[in-house]
Amino acid sequence: MKRSSQIGLTLVVVIVAAAGYAASKYTTWTQAVGSEANWCIEIPPSGNARDYLAQHHPEIAAVIDWRGWSIYPGKYCEIGEQPAHAIARRIATGQREEITLPVPSKRSVAEIAKALAPRIWADSASIAAALGTDNMKWQIAPNTYRIYWESSADQLAERLRAESQAWWTAERIKRAWALGLSQREVVTLASIVQEETANAAEAPTVAGLYLNRLKKKMLLQADPTLKYALGDWSIQRLLDEDKKVDSPYNTYRNPGLPPGPIRIPELAYVEAVLNADQHNYLYMCAKPDGSGTHAFARTYNQHVRNARAYQNMLNRERIYR
């Protein structure tokens, strides 16, 4: 009789302990995690995701371990004050967020990679390697995209190339052919136009001027290509000596377009080339009024007068380089 009482007491203790453990688990699972209206959990695709969760969000990791659920890497936002089990279920079913990724217009692949790296999991070095050399700049279309935060550098590069291909519709390709240019050549010319003018309104005029020179087989003599060849964008006044630089990008010495873009141009400038103005301008020079616009000329004599006015301004401002 005494033995039965002891067994019964032991069972009661075990049941109470189990109930207490279950209650504590239930409390942990149903307790709100976080206090902000919106916060995010970023689970990296590399390494041990369980260890990451256990270290940074142990209450969520406990639910996932207890349930035996899988963990999908990614960025989980709009969490607010949700209970741990609700967040765990989202992670276990991969209900992650797409992020907004603005891809800017930059002068190099390295600059693009540096701009994108803080927004996604991949680092700048791996992004730059995946995007390839600067010769591949024509395959990047600056725009704003939606992409998963955990995307690898290779996945990002593939996405950007796919977006660039999609941008080149049959109609745009037809326009390029009508100009006698390939897609790469259109982007190359657009990069020169963008470096030549920050004024989008005159971009089609600048594009038309360069197309006129190409048709007449004149040297482009585009100052931005010299700065690119010299590796110095800070130059304000190019000298005759600069025009002798030995580079395939020196359009003062080499006929036609350079071998590739001198920057990743904005799509608006690519459109400016595809829809270039038709006129008879062959020369241009920055206006001396600081407006950032250009004086266009049909004859060399008129161009010389425009250039002299600009050089006089540089002399007054003591800008010699």
Outline where the language-model segments fall.
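Conserved catalytic or metal-liganding residues and their short signature motifs at active sites
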Residues: 2-228, 247, 265-268, 272-280, ...
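Conserved SxxK-family serine transpeptidase/carboxypeptidase catalytic domain
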Residues: 221-263
